[in-house]
Amino acid sequence: PNEVMTVDPVLYDALKKVSDANCREIYLGPLYASLENLCMSNDDAAAAQFDPEKDDDAAEEAAAVAAFAQNPDDISMEFPGENQVCLHVSDAYQAYAAEMGYTAYLDFFWMKNAFLIDYLADTIRGEGYQLGIISSKDGFVRCLDETGEKEYQYPLYHLSGNEIQSHGTMMYEGPKSIVFFHAYQAGSPDTYRYYQYQDGTMRTPYLSASDGKDHTAASELIVYSGEYGCADTLLAAFFDYQAESLSGELLKT
């Protein structure tokens, strides 16, 4: 931290985009590491040790990291230009990180594939390809088709109780970016990002910088855009998905 580094242009653009959107969740790197430990636990007792809703030490850690993450004086990014980035970290946060044994302050975590798919889409288009779909198993889709001559399908699901049920199909024409927020495991990449307790309680990767805990306004939310990529679509809707309830008016904007 506190040194200017030259990074790959793709990484620079991704960091700049997150910073411009004021998405402080990228600064929750230490808590994402704890969440991975929770999700890889073999039983509820082991998982609870990493759960701020069930363990006092975990709750104290989540609150501390969130407090640092919220405060630009404690952690922030500066972009001098020329693909240069400087991660500013306060002495207080560095001391706490050393005490806790943290190795990373930043992590895109569940957001990473949105940026990767956008990069692949831009690269493919740059080579002259204008058809096809790029998708990831954790809920990001880019349809490149600009002809308007073909109709595409996106399956819809809904969590009812503990059962994931099919709820039809969304038909669309390209180009389109689709982001699928979901409060349950929906694919193999979710294995290390979600954990379900025996009582049905689910922990998700949607941690908030407000308190370091996961928040979801609904069991699922599909957001799409014909103008923006997956990353911009994600950043535009993420805070609404973390609200106490979904606002249709906000999502329309």
List the model feature ranges, each with a label.
Residues 1-253:
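Mature catalytic core of soluble alpha/beta enzymes
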